[in-house]
Amino acid sequence: MASPAAGGVVIIGSGLIGRSWAMLFASGGFKVKLYDIEQQQITNALESIRKEMKSLEQSGSLKGSLGAEQQLSLISGCGNLAEAVEGAMHIQECVPENLELKKKIFAQLDRIVDDQVILSSSSSCLLPSKLFTGLAHVKQCIVAHPVNPPYYVPLVELVPHPETAPATMDRTYALMKKIRQTPVRVLKEIDGFVLNRLQYAIISEAWRLVEEGIVSPNDLDLVMSDGLGMRYAFIGPLETMHLNAEGMVSYCDRYSEGMKRVLKTFGPVPEFSGDTVEKVNQDMCMKVPDDPEHLAARRHWRDDCLMQLSKLKHQMQPQ
């Protein structure tokens, strides 16, 4: 078996995101300690990880160069926070998206860690200035926001606190590359970071188009899945602009007036309530009933699609 990568990783919280991070770090050869306050939660998480890794290995989708048993041997559980973080080089917090809970966790960590470990939060929208301000080890703090489900979608947004040391960003970036994720540097904090700001802009306009009777919910989803989404799976909106003309300058010369005209027709932020909720819910439930069994089956199908897409993207990388 290959030697474990230097330094250990600690995962705080054994839910879906925590389990996914544990699998990703193990795939890179890192020893992983999974911490939770409830021993039964740890036991359940380790069993879930075992089942998923075995399934991934059978389907040829397991990440990394190590086999499932080798990766599983790198993951252990721990119910004592001080013991868990001893000797760690990276701590990834994965507790629920609650500011006070996360601040409590980081305050506890701040009292017991050394001056070398990276303190990273998986928060999807809480600003680093709200999470880390006042900590003695604030220079070692960063948000590393994964995309759900992290094992199948590689993007990780790295968001610094205003006092985060450049070395913390660099080390976290290198670590994400080591486990074959795709890190992006958010140069300064902003509400919603980058991914959710783009996602919410799409959701907002999608909602308005349905609410105003322009398009049905199902057809709206098709516009993304069979239209924009197919391009955006391989190139982003800015490169799309660049390729859809003779470069970016040409695109802006040709289309900027039309874009501005349409953008001026966008309405206010929707309320996401009332009749439109019922309308969208009805169409979605016709496609996927909202009982646990059907939702789980659809998520499983989604994850299979994402894994196959990930393989295709790897194969299609430009030479």
Curated annotation (Swiss-Prot):
GO molecular-function term, one example from the UniProt record: protein homodimerization activity
Major subcellular location class: cytoplasm
Pfam families in UniProt: 3HCDH, 3HCDH_N
Sites of Phosphoserine modification: S3
Residues carrying N-acetylalanine: A2
EC supergroup of this enzyme: oxidoreductase
Gene Ontology biological process terms from the UniProt entry: D-glucuronate catabolic process to D-xylulose 5-phosphate; fatty acid metabolic process
InterPro entries with a match to the protein in the record: 3-OHacyl-CoA_DH, 3-OHacyl-CoA_DH_CS, 3-OHacyl-CoA_DH_NAD-bd, 3HC_DH_C, 6-PGluconate_DH-like_C_sf, 6PGD_dom2, NAD(P)-bd_dom_sf
Catalytic activity: L-gulonate + NAD(+) = 3-dehydro-L-gulonate + NADH + H(+)
Keyword tags: Acetylation, Cytoplasm, NAD, Oxidoreductase, Phosphoprotein
Binding site for NAD(+): L16, I17, D36, E97, K102
Compartments where located: Cytoplasm
PROSITE patterns cross-referenced by the UniProt entry: 3HCDH
Regulation of its function: Inhibited by malonate.
GO cellular component: cytosol
EC assignment: 1.1.1.45
PANTHER family: 3-HYDROXYACYL-COA DEHYDROGENASE FAMILY PROTEIN (PTHR48075), LAMBDA-CRYSTALLIN HOMOLOG (PTHR48075:SF1)
Purpose: Has high L-gulonate 3-dehydrogenase activity. It also exhibits low dehydrogenase activity toward L-3-hydroxybutyrate (HBA) and L-threonate.
Subunit structure: Homodimer.
Family recorded in the similarity comment: Belongs to the 3-hydroxyacyl-CoA dehydrogenase family.
Protein name stated in the entry: Lambda-crystallin homolog
Gene behind the chain: Cryl1
